[in-house]
Amino acid sequence: MNLNIVEYPDKKLREKSKEVKSFDSKLHELLDSMYPIMMNTNGIGLAAIQVAFPLRALILNIPDEDGEQPDENLIEMINPVLSNYSGEIVYQEGCLSVPKFYEDVKRYSNITVNYQDRDANTITLEAEGLFAIAIQHEMDHLDGLLFIDKLSYSRRKKFEKEYKRMQKDKKNG
């Protein structure tokens, strides 16, 4: 499957993803195709909508203490739902769909998420810190939200200005 990352301001990123009902070879092929894209772009998470598939599916591979992302750390979440959350944490986030822009975002520091794996098994997972942040970031994509939507008015204006400048620079080579 030949996939490309959808970049802001593409309207596809604003689509609300649909619940996955068929846990079949098409879903498996999509998940298998997403992983190398995420890893080759130095990502830690990727939602299906970011490769133009509006399905409630995402993948994560959080770096370990040594900064490594071994394949066995891959987590695939289908139809994830937050069931519990607490605390706050501010972290500088970036996004494969909003390249070269990073900004502080406030999120829950501890979460519990219920989801299904690629074989429709139900799983409950507790996460904290960067892992919790990444899950929330990717889950936002499933609802058509980007991390820049969480910025204050002034920070959002700063982003829009920087984004326009970057686009202009890109055109002028």
Regions found by a protein language model. Name each.
Residues 1-173:
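Positively charged
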